[in-house]
Each structure stands twice: as C-alpha cells, then as structure tokens.
Amino acid sequence: MTRWLPERRSRRIVLAVVAAAVVVFGLIQLVPYRVDNPPVTQEPPWDSARTRRLAVAACFDCHSNDTHTYFWEDVAPVSWWITKHVKDGRAALNFSECTKSGGESGDAVETIRNGSMPPGYYTWLGLHADAQLTAKERQELADGLMRTLRGAGCGGGG
C-alpha cells in the first residue's frame, strides 16, 4: 500500500527547511538597501508641460530623485533589485540633476522610440499604468525630450 503522507522524519526535514527559509528571509530584511530620494538640484528646461507630464509618468521613477515605490518594493530581495535598477537609471539619465550645459539627448530619445523604455516589466500586472504610453504619446515624449535635453547635462549622452 502506498503512503500518501511523508514519513515523520521527512516532515521534520521539510519543516526545518521552511523554518530556515523564513528566518533567512527575516534576516535579509535587516540589510539597509533601499531607494533614497536626494534633493532635486535642477530639472532641465522643459520644452512643454506635456513633455514633463509624460516624462514624470514614464521615466521619473528610475530617472529622477523623485522615485515612488510600492510597499512590496521595499521588501528584500526585491528592494535590492529595484535600488540597483534606479541607481543605474539615474547614472544614465537623471532629470533631477541637470546642469546648464553638456549632455546629449540621443540615447534617451532612441530608447523611447525603439520601445525599450519604459521597460515592459515596469507595467506588468497593471502597475505604473500611467507609464503605458500609446504610440502617439511615445512619439510626443521622444520629440519633446529631444528638444528639452539638447544641451542639458542630465547624463546619458548620445
């Protein structure tokens, strides 16, 4: 006759593994690796309010010092991935730290036009729904950023 329930010893092993996983998960929450929002030093001279609205919706969470996260994005190890992603995004282009000269808009505009920004996973499950741009909005944003970032040193040159 086949036994459907694991032996008592096997159950203990499974419970020990689950308990260890819960303890490790709890301990990694103590690693202080979160997204910070330093002060905005200078935004670029936006060509229009529409361009800024589209950029805020589609770009600012990773490319500015005004990052908004959901509560579960503060739970490790998700927080580790989000923080690295935001740091990399800000290093490439940061709308909150633009200087009066330098920089080019080429890379930013190209990634918007080719559809790689904002990345698809950013809007999974209806999250960040305002970042789901239509083709027309994508074109408006790309054109507006081309005009806005020309000569603005926000990083991420082309």
Annotate each language-model stretch with its function:
Residues 1-9:
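N-terminal Lys/Arg-rich, disordered targeting/topogenic segments
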Residues 8-16:
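N-terminal membrane topogenic signal
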Residues 15-32:
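Hydrophobic membrane-insertion alpha-helices, especially the h-region
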Residues 34-55:
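Electrostatic cytochrome c docking/interface patches
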Residues 55-67, 117, 141:
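The canonical Cys-X-X-Cys-His
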Residues 71-77:
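Short cysteine/histidine-rich zinc-coordinating motifs and their immediately flanking basic loops
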Residues 80-127:
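Extracytoplasmic electron-transfer domains, predominantly the class I c-type cytochrome c fold
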Residues 126-155:
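C-terminal capping alpha-helices of c-type cytochrome domains
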